[in-house]
């Protein structure tokens, strides 16, 4: 994560977000382990008035299969109270929402907003079919293994000193 404070490369800020181009990103290739899981920061993007950071959580196939099997079994068991639904969600490997903070030399910037892309090679719930194509496109764009589950969070940070200027 230390590379984020050293963001110096100038990139065209007029990019279109829905069409991801390889020359729009500053490749980071930073990885770290948190809570015994592998996480990656594949790229950083400039946005008007700020910066966007992609953070990817890797879900190995065996872990994904075990969690989703338990999740499906409990979900299909019949009526569930709100408390039981919350208990079931603990087995959903995609049910995770980090809150991003960008540390700079003088400040800590909280995430402005975020998007989540879920890649589930098993195509079992809870990922919906409408999420499938954009997530696959993003996983292929970064060269991630399609046989592994991925949750990619795109975290947006706003700040005047993060702006890309000519």
Describe each PLM feature range:
Residues 1-166:
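Alpha-helical, hydrophobic structural elements that either
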């Amino acid at each position: 994560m230390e590379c984020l404070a050293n963001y110096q490369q100038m990139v065209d800020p007029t990019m279109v977000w829905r069409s991801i181009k390889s020359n729009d990103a500053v490749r980071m290739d930073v990885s770290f382990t948190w809570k015994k899981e592998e996480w990656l920061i594949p790229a950083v993007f400039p946005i008007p008035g700020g910066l966007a950071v992609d953070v990817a959580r890797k879900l190995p196939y065996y872990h994904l299969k075990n969690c989703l099997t338990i999740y499906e079994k409990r979900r299909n068991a019949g009526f569930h109270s709100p408390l039981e639904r919350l208990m079931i969600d603990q087995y959903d490997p995609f049910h995770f929402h980090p809150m991003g903070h960008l540390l700079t030399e003088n400040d800590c910037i909280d995430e402005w907003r975020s998007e989540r892309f879920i890649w589930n090679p098993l195509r079992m719930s809870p990922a919906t079919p409408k999420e499938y194509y954009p997530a696959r496109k993003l996983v292929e764009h970064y060269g991630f293994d399609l046989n592994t589950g991925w949750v990619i969070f795109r975290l947006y940070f706003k700040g005047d000193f993060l702006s890309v200027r000519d």
